[in-house]
A protein has these predicted regions:
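Signal peptide processing junction and immediate N-terminal pro/mature segment
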Residues: 25-32
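An amphipathic alpha-helix signature
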Residues: 104-112, 130, 134-137
Length: 172
């Protein structure tokens, strides 16, 4: 049997098209399976904790100014608004990128031992119950990785790019 170039090209195109479809079906099935294995009660608990715990106040761009009406798709993606004080200038971490690189146990360990610069209330995170930390992790993972990394820390002797809030030095 002899196949001319046109028939051979069609055969290759058909194989590629079928392969592409099979890969997309497998991806869709894996995504559906991931969603079906998520315990939505735990995710909802994490959503609640991120709201009442104040996580969004800093880690979600525009959250405070919108009175909490920022779309959830932007939640916990960090911010380029800096917090400047005697410690330097810090920026709210993109928690969705950060958490996507950790296992649940790594997140719990990190949250329990974190020591961060102001204004992050790391001591409150350290004090959270393990089941609440796990719920917060599940919620952040449910949101999925998105956004860009926050700007890097700026030492006290360097001028940060605006915008930033300036904290006064404590009284002596």
């Amino acid at each position: 049997m002899r196949i001319n170039r046109r028939q051979g090209g069609r055969s290759v195109l058909t194989v590629l098209l079928v392969s592409w479809c099979a890969v997309n079906v497998a991806i869709a099935e894996a995504s559906e399976q991931r969603l079906s294995t998520v315990d939505m009660k735990i995710v909802e608990r994490g959503r609640y904790l991120s709201k009442i715990g104040g996580c969004n106040d800093c880690h979600t761009p525009g959250y405070l100014l919108s009175e909490g009406k920022t779309p959830e798709k932007l939640w916990l993606t960090g911010d380029s608004f800096g917090w400047r004080g005697p410690w330097g200038t810090t920026y709210p971490t993109n928690l969705r990128l950060f958490v996507s690189s950790l296992t649940e146990d790594q997140w719990v360990s990190t949250a329990k031992s974190l020591k961060a610069r102001p204004p992050m209330p790391w001591f409150n995170l350290n004090a959270m119950e393990e089941n609440d930390l796990r719920a917060l992790y599940q919620f952040i993972r449910y949101l999925g990785p998105d956004g860009a990394p926050a700007p890097a820390y700026v030492p006290p002797d360097k001028e940060p790019n605006p915008p930033y809030a300036l904290f006064p030095s404590p009284p002596q």
